[in-house]
């Protein structure tokens, strides 16, 4: 959802979505963005959203109520356009792709334990080349199939191995399944 990019602009805008997205609850995004100064109206907590950020974005110290990378990213992107330093406290760590990408683009984002500290941008973000690898949760089905079939051999290429996204691999390693990785590289998020 582009709310995380748009909310840091001093604009009024509307967001709509396809049928699937329009069924997803938006309250968990509406709550922190409203606390940051956005005026938001919705369809009973669903899309479409009308967001008025024309008065600017205020800093926030937000305690995440649910583990959600989408909520965290909404706050991260919005806080970049804020009037002061913001922080996000994660009860349970979520995937960290947004933080990695934003740091590589020049944003000042720090981590102190479970707290993420976001400094407002002082200049434009740098452009970077972004490579989007395959989703490990989609690969998990094929890995499980290979594990339960004796003498199987499965090779997956270009699959994301971010530590916050490979819980199933960690479980399989504890079960003594033979899983090897090769050609590992770090990308921009």
List each model region and its residues.
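Structural preference for solvent-exposed beta-strand-turn elements
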Residues: 1-189
């Amino acid at each position: 959802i582009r709310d995380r990019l748009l909310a840091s602009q001093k604009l009024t805008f509307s967001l709509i979505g396809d049928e699937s997205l329009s069924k997803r609850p938006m309250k968990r995004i509406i709550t922190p963005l409203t606390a940051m100064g956005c005026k938001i109206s919705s369809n009973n907590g669903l899309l479409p959203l009308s967001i008025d950020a024309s008065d600017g974005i205020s800093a926030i110290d937000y305690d995440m109520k649910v583990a959600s990378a989408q909520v965290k990213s909404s706050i991260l992107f919005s806080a970049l356009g804020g009037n002061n330093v913001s922080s996000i406290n994660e009860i349970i760590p979520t995937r960290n792709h947004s933080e990695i990408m934003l740091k590589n683009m020049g944003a000042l984002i720090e981590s102190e334990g479970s707290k993420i500290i976001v400094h407002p941008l002082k200049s434009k973000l740098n452009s970077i080349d972004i490579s989007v690898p395959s989703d490990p949760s989609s690969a998990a089905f094929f890995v499980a199939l290979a594990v339960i079939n004796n003498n199987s051999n499965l090779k997956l290429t270009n699959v994301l191995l971010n530590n916050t996204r490979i819980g199933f691999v960690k479980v399989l390693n504890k079960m003594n399944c033979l899983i090897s990785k090769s050609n590992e590289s770090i990308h921009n998020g």
